[in-house]
Amino acid sequence: MKVVIVGGVAGGASAVARIRRLDEHAQIVMIERSGYISYANCGLPYYVGGVIKEQEELTLQTPESFWDRFRIDVRVRQEVTAINPAEKTVTVHALDSGKVYTETYDKLLLAPGAKPTVPALSGMDSERVFTLRTVEDTLRIRRFVEDQKPKTAVLAGGGFIGLEMAENLVEMGVSVTIVQRPKQLLAPLDADMASFVHAEMRRHGVALRLGETVTGFRQDGDSVLTLLEDSEPLRSDMVLLAIGVTPDTHLAKEAGLELGIRGSIVVNERMETSVPDIYAVGDAVEVTHFVTGQKALISLAGPANKQGRIAADNICGGNSHFHGSQGSSVLKLFSLTAASTGINEKAAQAAGIAYDRVVLFPASHATYYPGAQSMAMKVLYEKESLRLLGAQIVGGEGVDKRIDVLATAIRAKMTALELTELDLSYAPPYSSAKDPVNMAGFMIEDLESGKVRQFHWNEVEDLPCDGNATLLDVRTEGEYRRGHLNGFRNIPLDDLREHLDELDRGKPVYVNCQTGLRSYLACRLLTQYGFTCSHLSGGYSFYQVVTQERQTARSAYPCGMEKL
C-alpha cells in the first residue's frame, strides 16, 4: 500500500507516524509546502518573543529523523498543485528546483491546515505588514524585531495568535495596539468573561481599539499607517494581521471533493471525504460540534492530532471514529489564564437551547494555604435536561485543571448535578475540600431545587428603584464605601438578623455582595424568614469588571472578614 500525505504539521505528522506503527511495509510519502514539518504551531509567538530560545526547539521532528525512525519519505519545499482522483495521482511542484512531477497513491490524506485570513486591503505588500502561520513567517518577524527594534506595533485581530503575540511584544518593550471589528477579544468567551481579558491587557499597557474596522495600510517612511474606517490612522513600526484563519482547501475544491461551511472539506466520522480513498484531517475539515450536534470549524491542535490518528487507523483497515469536538482551549496572557470548553451563551442562543448559568469566584486552593489565587468561573447548562453545555474560566493558578475537569464532564455527558459527586483530589496546596467544580454543581443544585434565585449583571439596571423592592448590599461597610450599586442599602451579613424587622416581607429582596457567596447566605437566611429573595450572580466584582473593565476584587476579603 502506498499512502501520500499532503501537509506535515499536526494532523499529517500524527497520521504518518500512526500508519507506520500499524503497517511496517507501507510506502509512505509526506509532502510539505514549507521547509519544516511537525513543528509546534502554538509555540511560534513565544519564539518571536524569545521565550523559546532556539529555532530547533520548535520542530518536533525533521525529515531526517522521520526517515531514521519511521522510514517515511518526507519532501519539504514541495507543493501539491493538483489531485487526479480518477487516476489516483497528485501533481507536485518542487519549489527550489522548479521540477514538476506526478506521484501515485493508493490512499491520499489531505492535511493542508488553514491559512491566515488576509482581506483584500491596500498596502498588504508593505515589508512592515506580517502574518503568522509557518516557521518561515516566524523567522521573518523575529529578524525584523531583532534588526529594526520596533517601538510600536498594531495587531489586527484579537484571537489566540493575536493576543499571544501582543503579550510577547509587550514583554520585549514594544507598545501594542489591538484593532478589531468585534467588540470583544477571544470569541470563545462570552463578552462578560472577556472583560477580564480586556482589563488584563490594558493593565499591561495594551491599547484596545475594539469595534473598529481596518480599511488598509500605507507605508510612510520607516513606519506604516493602519487606516481605519471611522478614526484617524494609527502609526506604528510594524503590523501583524491575526484576524483568523480560513480552511486551505483549493486543492480539494479543484478535485471535486464536497465542501462544507466556509469552504471546509466534508468528512464522515472515519475522516473519509466524498471521494473514495481520500481522507482529510485538521483545520481544513468540517466537524460536528460535540455539544450542539451542528457543523463547525474548530481550528485546534488537539482535534487535528486525534483526527490524524483516526484516519491512519482507517487507512490501515481499522474502523475508528471521530465523535466531534467541543473546542476546549486555554490561553496564557501575562499573569492571567483564560480557558473555555463547550459552547458559550451566544452559541447556545444560536442553537436554540434553553439554558441557565452560574458564576462563581472560587480560589485556586485552600485560602489558608499561601498563594491562593481567585478565578472567575462560568458554567452553562441546559434547563430541561440539566446537561452541561460549556464552561469559561479566567484567573490565575488552577484554571487549566478545572477547565479540563469540566471538559471531561461534558464529554461524558454528565448533568450539572453530577458535578457535586465528582471525587477530586484534595490537599491545601492544590485545591479545597469542595473543589471549584464541585461548587459549581452545588450552586446549580440549589438553583434547580428552588433553594435560591439569582439575577445577573445585565439585569441590574432593570431592578425596581421606586420602593417596590428592597435592594440590599450585605458586604462590610468598608467594601460598600469603596463602591456599590445605586440604590442598594448596606446591611452587613453578620448584622442582618438584627435588622429583619426593618425589611418589608411583602417586597421582593435583591441582594448583592462582592462575589456571590454572602448574598447567597443572605438569601437562604431571608427565605427562611418569609422573604422572596434573589442574589446577584458573581456579585459586585463581576458587575464592576464587566461594566467598567477594571478589577475591584482586591477590595474584598474572603467571606467579608475585612481588616478595618
Mark where each language-model region is.
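Rossmann-like dinucleotide-binding cores of NAD(P)H-dependent redox enzymes
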Residues: 59, 152-153, 160-218, 298-304, ...
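A Rossmann-like FAD-binding core segment of flavoenzymes
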Residues: 25-27, 69, 75-96, 103, ...
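Short hydrophobic core segments
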Residues: 6, 103-113, 156, 234-244, ...
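Beta1-alpha1 glycine-rich phosphate/pyrophosphate-binding loop at the start
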Residues: 1-77, 117, 166-189, 328, ...
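Rhodanese-like catalytic fold shared by cysteine-dependent sulfurtransferases
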Residues: 417-428, 432-469, 477-510, 514-564
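FAD-site-proximal beta/loop scaffold in flavoenzymes
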Residues: 125-149, 225, 233-313, 405, ...
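Glycine-rich dinucleotide-binding loop and its adjacent helix/turn
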Residues: 110-172, 207, 261, 267-269, ...
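Mid-to-C-terminal Rossmann-like scaffold of FAD/NAD(P)H-dependent oxidoreductases
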Residues: 1, 8, 284-397, 428-432, ...
